[in-house]
A protein has these predicted regions:
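A short acidic, helix-capping loop that chelates divalent metal ions and anchors anionic groups
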Residues: 123-130
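Conserved N-terminal segment of class I S-adenosyl-L-methionine
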Residues: 1-83, 98-104, 130-142, 151, ...
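Surface-exposed, flexible loop/turn segments at secondary-structure boundaries
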Residues: 72, 122-123
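Class I S-adenosylmethionine-dependent transferase superfamily signal
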Residues: 107
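Hydrophobic adenine-recognition pocket in adenosine-nucleotide-binding enzymes
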Residues: 91-94
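Conserved beta-strand signature within the Rossmann-like core of class I S-adenosyl-L-methionine
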Residues: 111-121
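A conserved beta-strand element that flanks and buttresses the S-adenosyl-L-methionine
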Residues: 87
């Protein structure tokens, strides 16, 4: 994202919420269920304060990278970097519409295999300037059309994340769709248990 004002808003947001952390084990489970090719390197593009790259390293022992322009430690992206897989989770809806194609183009130069998780509704998070964090809200078909301008495939897979869609840029077999379904069921069950536990805890 090249919009410096927008990037600075997210820097301010992270500063205001310094203890924020996002556990993406369920996301890893979804991504892993769809992988039908060898991966030796992974990039979390728009990583925020999540542990997705760390999970990939711990589970697969591969080279991992993090990139997020709003986090100083991860704000540099090597122009020559190439990886086997990119995860782009809860990112594109934060990108201004006039920058979407540029982001897709940049990622397509890094890898042909991208796992997108894109939210389709407004966010609960409000930026320091009063704007909703999700500035580009579009239907699934719009995102697929955009992705297909830069990648060969834009296949929808199951997601357990409410109000979002998962799209992958590689061909997936029926076998891996079954694995994806199992991951979806496990994530949904875990989420149900979590909701019941917290309801009883605070009742």
């Amino acid at each position: 994202m090249t919009n410096k004002k927008k990037v600075n808003l997210y820097k301010d947001l992270y500063a205001e919420n310094s203890n924020y952390f996002r556990n993406l084990i369920p996301m890893y489970r979804l991504i892993n269920s769809c992988i039908n090719f060898e991966i030796k390197s992974f990039l979390d593009y728009g990583c925020g304060k999540s542990n997705l790259a760390d999970i990939f390293y711990n589970m697969r022992k591969i080279k991992t990278y993090k990139y997020d322009p709003a986090i100083n430690d991860y704000s540099y992206l090597d122009k020559h970097i190439k990886v086997d897989l990119i995860a782009n989770c809860d990112v594109m809806e934060h990108v201004p519409e006039d920058e979407v194609d540029n982001i897709f183009e940049e990622m397509s130069n890094i890898s042909k295999n991208i796992f997108f998780n894109i939210y389709l509704t407004r966010a609960e998070t409000i930026l320091p300037n009063g704007e909703n964090a999700h500035c580009t809200i579009k239907p699934i078909q719009w995102w697929q059309s955009k992705i297909l301008k830069h990648f060969k495939y834009a296949n929808i897979v199951l997601t357990s994340y409410k109000n979002s869609v998962c799209i992958i840029t590689w061909k997936i077999s029926y076998y891996h769709r079954i694995l994806n379904f199992y991951a979806f069921i496990i994530n949904s069950f875990e989420h149900m248990i979590w909701k019941v536990f917290h309801y009883k805890l605070w009742k």
